[in-house]
């Protein structure tokens, strides 16, 4: 009986300790470990309760059911296993946070990358039609944020028609469509027209996911 009580006490003490450790690492509360034994050493975490983060507390995400987590985890892992441990270390990505109904300032989003905290938050309820592709889109933002000198937005923008201008930010425009154009006219999706960084991310995601249009424009 004493042994049983001791085990219960240990479990009670260890669980909060793990949660506190996770918070100290990535500054996101209410998380628990989903899987940390992966090929490329990515740590998968999930929301055990809704959480709110950000300087202005403007980022929100909610707990998912185990059934939904199990289903989407397989898809996420399959796609992110394309990136080696060495590559992920170079770009500073270590933690994948799974939750649903992810939003920033009230605007729903597929993912929120943070190369400083080595974290990518993923909305597992994002549109299934684009879900796998947007995983690579968000990974590109991690790459871009880690190597801004390589991905020069001015050089990228110079390939566009002179009369075209990107929006000041991705949320400053209504160009949010993710459907792949059959006729690209210099852009692969409507969202590509929003900002240079989103344009790069859309091209990268199509290359990684393997669904480039049948014909693309010459540079």
Predicted ranges, named:
Residues 2-9:
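Sec-dependent signal peptide recognition
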Residues 10-17:
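Hydrophobic h-region of N-terminal signal peptides that target proteins for export
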Residues 20-69, 98-101, 168-181, 197, ...:
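Non-catalytic architectural context of zinc metalloproteases
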Residues 54-116, 124:
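Auxiliary, metal-adjacent structural segments of Zn-dependent hydrolase domains
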Residues 92-219:
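Active-site-flanking segments in enzyme catalytic domains
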């Amino acid at each position: 009986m004493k042994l049983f009580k001791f085990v219960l006490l240990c479990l009670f003490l260890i669980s909060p300790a793990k949660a506190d450790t996770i918070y100290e690492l990535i500054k996101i509360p209410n998380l628990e470990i989903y899987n940390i034994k992966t090929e490329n050493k990515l740590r998968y975490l999930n929301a055990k309760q809704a959480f709110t983060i950000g300087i202005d507390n403007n980022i929100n995400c909610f707990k998912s059911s185990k059934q939904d987590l199990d289903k989407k985890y397989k898809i996420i892992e399959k796609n992110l296993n394309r990136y080696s441990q060495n590559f992920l270390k170079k770009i500073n990505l270590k933690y994948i946070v799974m939750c649903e109904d992810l939003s920033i300032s009230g605007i729903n989003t597929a993912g929120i990358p943070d190369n400083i905290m080595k974290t990518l938050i993923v909305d597992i309820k994002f549109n299934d039609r684009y879900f796998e592709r947007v995983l690579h889109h968000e990974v590109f933002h991690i790459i871009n944020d880690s190597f801004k000198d390589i991905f020069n937005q001015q050089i990228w923008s110079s390939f566009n028609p002179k009369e075209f201008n990107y929006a000041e930010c991705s949320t400053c425009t209504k160009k949010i469509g993710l459907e792949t154009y059959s006729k690209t006219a210099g852009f692969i999706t409507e969202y590509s027209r929003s900002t240079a960084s989103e344009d790069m991310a859309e091209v990268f995601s199509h290359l990684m996911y393997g669904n480039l249009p049948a014909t693309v424009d010459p540079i």
